Every structure is written in C-alpha cells, then in structure tokens.
C-alpha cells in the first residue's frame, strides 16, 4: 500500500546542447500526459509557450487515482474512456468516437502549466502559464 505523495514534474528540454525550455505542471495522475501534450504542441505544432499552456488536452483514465484519495468509485480505472477539455474540436471528438472511445468532458483537464522558453537568437526568455491557476512564467 505505499503511494507517492509528491510527483512534481520539472522538465528541461535541450536543443543543440543548450536549454530550449523549462516547464512543469501540477495534476497528479495526468501530469505526464499533460506535459507531453504541452511539449508536442511547442516542438511539433509551433505553438508559443502561452498557446501551448492554454491548448485543449486529452487524458486517459488507465491509472486513475494512483496518488490515493477518497473518490475511489468516481476515479477507478476506466479503460477505453477519455477525458477531454471542452475546447477539443468537434472533428477530434468524431475521430475518437469512431475509434471506439467513450468521451467525457470538463472545463479543466490539466493542472497549471508553467514554462519558460530560452530564445538564444534574441538573448531573451519567454514565459507562459495556463489559465488554470494564479501562476506566472518568469525567467531572469
């Protein structure tokens, strides 16, 4: 019965031997899922730190409640179910349903994401934070 009590996810992405961005998220069971989606939104889809922080995301419920808690019946593992942010486009919803997923929706599907982008070309840093907390992306 032991379970982790802290699963902080500070991350640094490197490019050409230099830090490209530093980022992290709160959110228990969904932290790694949300960080990967954030990272891919930046490196694959060209979003800014702020755009990627606020982008809609999708969570699985395969390992729900790994940190413990009291909502055991509500948050037990549900294979084949996905939790989507309300802002996920209709065409994505349609594709996921066609693949056989059961979808549920919430206004907020991620903990606060905070990030700093290191712009080595212009010798500056760019911060971004999701709108899910009272957080700020600050670098110096």
Question: Which positions does each model-derived feature cover?
Answer:
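Proteins synthesized as precursors that undergo proteolytic processing into mature forms
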Residues: 1-107
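In a subset of proteins, long, contiguous C-terminal domains/tails are tracked
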Residues: 90-140
